[in-house]
């Protein structure tokens, strides 16, 4: 465990692997950092290892069904008895987060756990990777970024607000990506000459960490206010990332937004015999679905045509419902 702290071991592991190339799976090396970016690592074991990037537990893993296909994948039939998906059932786990210890030990105080986790992260993982300089300023940057999860990322504005250089903000953002705290989602562009937003969006990979950073401890408070949608969207994007990463695949995930503000929260790119296909997903905090929630998906279909696959509005209800042509209201629990 934490192999990045002992990079000298990798040379010996390489020698052992090369001496037993016909035997696979003898070594499992884990760590909380991107090994390729860790200090002192010169041996990458290229050609000898399979790399898996594991985020906190997914909803599938927490409900004991980790191999269930996504709804749009082959075999992705609806659940016979989906887990509770009401708002009351959804927000507690969203505030608590999905780290294994918090899932396995429900009596643990999530606030104290995240406080300790972030303290350890700042004192150990971050300083192991780079010289931060002003640690307090970095903490303020992380909190400010948490308040912007699921929003268009204006690093220049954020840097100006905090009184730091834009290059510092870029470096710190890259550090958060390297330590798997955040992911930057790029907008999807097609060669259509359309006026589309080119600014990326940032998402935290764990909603419990996000809620802790913005001072939310109560599920009712997390479910209220103008940022509730951003928090739920963060949870859905995290689930889509986990679905790919936890089976060894690279996420092919985007969002779509026009210059006038028409948006689709997530696009999952897949391929079939017809070529590229885009599965659109909208995220809504309501427990009641309506056809108007699919307006962004309809606009996307009008712009991209047959490239757009049947879409979904992920919501907090408990049943699948048709929302017009090629759009289904999908309970969060079925994602």
Where do the protein language model's features map onto the residues?
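Walker B catalytic acidic pair
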Residues: 1-2
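Conserved catalytic/switch belt of AAA+ P-loop NTPases
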Residues: 10-29, 42-43
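Arginine/glycine-rich "motif VI" loop of SF2 helicases in the C-terminal RecA-like domain
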Residues: 245-246, 273, 299-307
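Short beta-strand-loop-alpha-helix junction that forms the active-site gateway
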Residues: 283-291
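Conserved nucleotide-binding/hydrolysis micro-motifs of P-loop NTPases
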Residues: 32-37, 56-61, 189, 209, ...
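Domain-level recognition of nuclease-like catalytic cores that cleave nucleotide substrates
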Residues: 314-335
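Accessory nucleic acid-recognition modules appended to NTPase machines
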Residues: 103-278
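Interdomain motor-coupling "hinge/lid" segment immediately C-terminal to the ATP-binding subdomain
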Residues: 34, 38-147, 151-152
């Amino acid at each position: 465990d934490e192999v990045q702290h002992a990079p000298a071991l990798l040379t010996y592991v390489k020698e052992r692997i090369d001496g037993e190339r016909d035997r696979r799976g003898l070594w499992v090396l884990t760590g909380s950092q991107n090994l390729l970016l860790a200090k002192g690592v010169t041996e990458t074991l290229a050609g000898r290892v399979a790399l898996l990037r594991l985020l906190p537990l997914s909803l599938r893993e927490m409900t004991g069904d980790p191999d269930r296909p996504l709804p749009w994948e082959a075999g992705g039939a609806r659940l016979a008895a989906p887990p509770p998906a009401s708002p009351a059932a959804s927000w507690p786990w969203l505030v608590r987060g999905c780290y294994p210890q918090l899932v396995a030990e429900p009596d643990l105080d999530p606030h104290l756990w995240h406080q300790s986790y972030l303290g350890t992260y700042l004192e150990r993982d971050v300083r192991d990777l780079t010289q931060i300089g002003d640690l307090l300023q970095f903490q303020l940057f992380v909190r400010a970024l948490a308040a912007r999860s699921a929003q268009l990322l204006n690093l220049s504005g954020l840097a100006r607000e905090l009184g730091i250089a834009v290059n510092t903000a870029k470096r710190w953002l890259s550090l958060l990506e390297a330590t798997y705290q955040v992911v930057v989602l790029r907008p999807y562009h097609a060669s259509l000459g359309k006026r589309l937003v080119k600014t990326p969006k940032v998402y935290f990979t764990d909603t419990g960490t996000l809620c802790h950073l913005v001072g939310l401890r109560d599920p009712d408070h997390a479910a209220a206010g103008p940022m509730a949608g951003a928090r739920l969207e963060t949870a859905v994007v995290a689930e889509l990332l986990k679905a790919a990463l936890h089976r060894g695949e690279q996420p092919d995930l985007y969002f779509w937004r026009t210059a006038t503000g028409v948006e689709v929260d997530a696009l999952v790119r897949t391929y079939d015999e017809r070529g590229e296909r885009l599965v659109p997903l909208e995220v809504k905090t309501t427990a009641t679905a309506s056809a108007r929630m699919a307006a962004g998906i309809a606009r996307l279909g009008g712009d991209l045509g047959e490239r757009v696959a049947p879409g979904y509005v992920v919501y907090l209800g408990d049943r699948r419902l048709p929302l017009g042509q090629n759009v289904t209201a999908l309970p969060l629990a079925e994602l």
